């Protein structure tokens, strides 16, 4: 791994089409995050087939332009990802949800998460969105990152989700105004 790989976040790009190789790499990132204890909608152990099925559905949403998918890649491959859920109800065309911000453990503490969030915010702004919302484990690294990036904490919901090991966890909702 070069000094550039260690010291700076890798470049972020938006995928408009997802290849089989990218599906496999995204699955690896998801499995690594769940193995590491991230509460991202899946229980441990997460099978490769379940992870792949999830990403195939995401790829379908990208193809239908219901989702925007961003990835961070280093010299080895995809190390992080985030999504914008663009397909909102008729009375909410101005907003999108930020979802599944995942960073492989080998790439953490390098600014990858922040770079992914900023890229998604910029794309949402360019798409005319003025409000983003998300949820995160209340006391987790992601919640601290969102607060540092200027997202407004709405508040926690006790026992909203489960950690991958089955333990209940509180979830905090955040929002970010893009027109301010």
Place the predicted regions along the sequence by residue.
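Terminal substrate-recognition subdomain of acyl/acetyltransferases
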Residues: 2-11, 15-18, 152, 163-180
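Conserved GNAT acetyl-CoA-binding A-motif
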Residues: 117, 124-137
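Conserved catalytic-core motifs of GNAT/GCN5-like acyltransferases
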Residues: 131-137, 152-169
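Acetyl-CoA-dependent GNAT
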Residues: 10, 14-100, 104, 117-119, ...
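Conserved active-site tyrosine of GNAT-family acetyltransferases
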Residues: 146, 151
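Active-site acidic-Proline motif in GNAT/NAT acetyltransferases
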Residues: 104-106, 110
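Helix-turn-helix
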Residues: 142
